[in-house]
Regions:
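Second-shell loop/turn segments in exported
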Residues: 19-22, 38-48, 63, 78-80, ...
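Extracellular/luminal Protease-associated
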Residues: 99-202, 259, 283-286, 390-391
């Protein structure tokens, strides 16, 4: 038996093993420099950059004591992708039998096969695509307005509804809010989608000025109700199509109890790869802030949680693919979860976290679930941080991976300082965002990101403890 003084000495000199070192800016920077290096080629899905990125994430998670939680006992969750790049096309329009000239530069088309033809098809105006009842779209080329009233389904869903109604081609009429040259340039770079996603045989874009000219030839206009038009169209559309498999990465930190429940952290690993043509001074979009920073934070949060006492619930760490193409990887996980979706008590997304200074208030995207809000508020207070309650960041809710999970009923949030100052965030979005100069350089701001990483560790401990937080029944945010 130890004498009292000797016991006191041992207690005072013993290391506090349950107190892991806080995450520092240098910890985040190490990962960002690697993931945003030119050797990773901009981390495009399906590229050599993907292999380097997913291998790196697996190594880092395994080194922190996590185990694989993907498909078939692996770290990976594969998903089938198709990439389409528009080629040449020919289009002929007639209104009441009279040819109507629409300039080639005023229409952009893509097919779901390498060559698609449409011969003397009827043209139907679909309005904004929200009132389709009573209109026959079978075999037709449908014109649909991109803009719709607030509360309408997203454009992607409205196009899907027209495809389900039998339209052979769907041409989206763009508004004047974004210049046509920018819209068509983005379209002609191509798109990426799930190989299983149904698309019209032919999809396309047309500026409002050209669509108005076409409808005027038929005695109609863009304000008309949905109806068949006295217009016929023939098309031949060529498209380059590339099918490949890309991967989410999924790891698990085992909890201390058999709760059958999971907390989920996620961050998208993908970016745009070679985003400029050959001969450009810098061809690679490295995505340092978007979103090597989020992946770096997720890795370090995994380490912080693994280094301390294990909370009762398991904690999953999901690095998603193809976020930049429409939350595809997160949507795939929501539709094909590697754990029962109802077992996920909350999902915390990490995206674009390296822009705010230390001391920034904490904003929350996805508030509205009382038990979750209370857990966040208590954690923020315990960390000596202050909440930003102006709700300006709510406009971003559908632009991040958490939205794919929230739609599936999982309580999904983003918590941090990078979107508490919308002016600061907008400066990034209007500058380096999705550009080759989003690099691991002196413009990275990581002291605020480190604060948010430590907040996420504390929040993770709270949310992974059933005694501190229980998911309410009835779905997500």
């Amino acid at each position: 038996m130890f004498k009292p003084l000797a016991l006191l000495f041992l207690l005072l000199s013993a290391p506090l093993a349950a107190q892991p070192a806080p995450i520092a800016p240098a910890d985040l920077l190490r990962h960002i420099r690697i993931l945003a290096d030119d050797s990773f080629q901009g981390r495009a899905p399906g590229s050599e950059g993907e292999r380097l990125t997913t291998d790196y994430i697996v190594r880092e998670l395994a080194a922190r004591g996590l185990e694989p939680a993907g498909e078939n006992g692996t770290w990976l969750q594969p998903l089938p992708i198709v990439e389409t790049v528009p080629g040449a096309s020919e289009v002929r329009w007639t209104a009441r039998g009279v040819p109507v000239e629409i300039a080639a530069e005023d229409i952009a088309l893509s097919g779901n096969e390498e060559v698609k033809r449409l011969t003397d098809a009827p043209v139907v105006f679909a309005g904004d695509g929200t009132r389709l009842a009573g209109v026959d779209f079978h075999g037709a080329a449908a014109l649909v307005l991109a803009q719709a009233p607030a509360g309408s389904p997203p454009l992607r869903q409205r196009v899907r509804a027209l495809t389900d109604a039998g339209a052979a081609a769907v041409i989206v009429v763009t508004g004047a809010d974004v210049p046509w040259n920018l819209i068509v340039a983005g379209f002609r770079r191509g798109s990426t989608r799930l190989d299983s996603e149904p698309l019209p045989n032919i999809a396309g874009l047309m500026p409002a000025r050209a669509a108005q000219r076409l409808l005027a030839a038929a005695g109609s206009d863009l304000g008309a109700a949905p109806a068949a038009l006295p217009i016929r169209v023939s098309m031949e559309v060529h498209t380059d199509i590339h099918r490949f498999t890309t991967n989410n990465v999924v790891g698990r930190l085992r909890g201390s109890g058999a709760t059958g429940e999971n907390l989920l952290f996620l961050a998208h690993w993908d970016h745009f790869g070679f985003c400029r043509p050959e001969g450009a001074p810098d061809r690679i979009c490295n995505g340092a802030v978007d979103n090597a920073s989020g992946v770096a934070m997720m890795i370090e949060v995994a380490g912080g949680l693994a280094a301390g006492p294990r909370p009762p619930r398991d904690i999953l760490f999901l690095a998603t693919t193809a976020e930049e193409e429409g939350l595809i990887g997160a949507g795939w996980f929501a539709a094909h979860p590697t754990v029962p979706l109802g077992s996920i008590v909350a999902a915390i997304n990490m995206d674009t976290v390296a822009i705010q200074p230390a001391g920034s208030p904490v904003a929350v995207i996805g508030r509205g679930i009382p038990a979750l809000d209370a857990a966040i508020d208590a954690t923020v207070a315990a960390m000596g941080r202050r909440l930003d309650n102006d709700d300006e960041a709510a406009e971003l809710v559908q632009r991040q991976d958490g939205w794919a999970l929230a739609r599936a009923g999982v309580p999904a949030i983003m918590v941090g300082g990078s979107f508490s100052d919308m002016a600061l965030l907008n400066r990034f979005l209007e500058g380096r965002y999705h550009e080759p100069n989003d690099q691991a350089d002196g413009e990275l701001v990581l002291d605020g990101a480190a604060e948010d990483a430590n907040l996420s560790v504390a929040l993770g401990r709270r949310l992974a403890d059933p005694a501190a937080y229980r998911r309410a029944t009835g779905g997500g945010s």
